[in-house]
């Protein structure tokens, strides 16, 4: 389906005289004539998502069978869109690869990706900072998602508050970012520290990493929601994808 980038490129070609208005009209009509969604019986694949939101529909692998994931993925790719499956199992990837042979599985982040169409590049850099090594799967979900959405990403991992010197050594990279995603479990203190050092938006991602009283990330979530530093927003527990989506929108403004 047509993306915002495709439409911008087409209009630019018309403005430069490289494509006539009649040909542009034919191309656009052909794109819009296609069904806005495809009913697979168990899912309705939204082919106009990229027009409304700038990026195609993303598949959440949780709760879907491998065959369902593969069928949705095949339909998305068939219409020329970029593929992103989050929380994907190895079994789901095997099923997807049977119909989308170019797909890639990112085991650390449990993502399936296949870039098929261009997206507008972000204006700056998104920095992904994570507190501990155990937080990296969520951080990688955010990093890979942001990259697929057209952003330049820098990773700063294992800089938790138990060793602040590790974080302070990265102040220049943090300050140069356009938006920062901070991933942390335990007590969730890292986003407040980072936000106190920079003048850019900080998106906090609590993770489910921690011992008993962390309550599966609830302690980190509440700590981040009660941050004393300004400029911090918070997404749901382990939601690296959601953080990356917001960061990408900010970076494309």
Predicted regions and their residues:
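Glycine-rich oxoanion-binding loops at beta->alpha junctions
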Residues: 111-113, 152-173, 218-219, 235
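Glycine-rich phosphate-binding loop
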Residues: 169-207
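Short glycine/serine/threonine-rich phosphate/pyrophosphate-binding segments
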Residues: 67-69, 135-140, 164-165, 184-194, ...
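C-terminal binding/interaction regions
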Residues: 130, 134, 171-175, 179, ...
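Glycine-rich phosphate/diphosphate-binding loop of Rossmann-like nucleotide-binding domains
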Residues: 123-165
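Long amphipathic alpha-helical segments
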Residues: 1-89, 94, 99
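Short glycine-rich or small-residue beta-strand-to-loop segments that form or flank ligand, phosphate
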Residues: 56-59, 83-84, 125-131, 180-182, ...
């Amino acid at each position: 389906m047509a993306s915002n980038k495709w439409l911008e490129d087409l209009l630019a070609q018309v403005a430069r005289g490289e494509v006539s208005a009649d040909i542009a009209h034919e191309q656009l009509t052909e794109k819009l004539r296609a069904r806005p969604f495809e009913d697979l019986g168990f899912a309705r694949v939204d082919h106009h998502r990229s027009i409304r939101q700038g990026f195609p529909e993303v598949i959440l692998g949780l709760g879907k069978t491998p065959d369902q994931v593969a069928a949705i993925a095949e339909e998305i790719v068939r219409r020329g869109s970029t593929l992103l499956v989050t929380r994907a199992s190895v079994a789901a990837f095997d099923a997807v690869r049977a119909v989308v042979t170019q797909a890639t599985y990112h085991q650390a982040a449990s993502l399936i990706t296949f870039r098929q169409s261009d997206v507008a590049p972000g204006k700056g850099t998104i920095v992904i900072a994570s507190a501990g090594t155990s937080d990296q799967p969520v951080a990688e979900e955010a990093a890979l998602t942001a990259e697929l959405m057209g952003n330049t990403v820098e990773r700063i991992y294992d800089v938790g508050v138990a060793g602040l010197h590790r974080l302070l050594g990265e102040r220049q990279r943090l300050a140069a970012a356009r938006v920062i995603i901070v991933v942390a479990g335990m007590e969730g203190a890292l986003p407040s520290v980072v936000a106190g050092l920079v003048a850019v938006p900080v998106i906090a991602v609590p993770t489910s990493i921690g011992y008993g009283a962390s309550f599966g990330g609830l302690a980190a979530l509440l700590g981040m929601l009660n941050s004393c530093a300004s400029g911090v927003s918070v997404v749901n527990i382990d939601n690296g994808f959601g953080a990356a989506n917001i960061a990408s929108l900010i970076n494309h403004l």
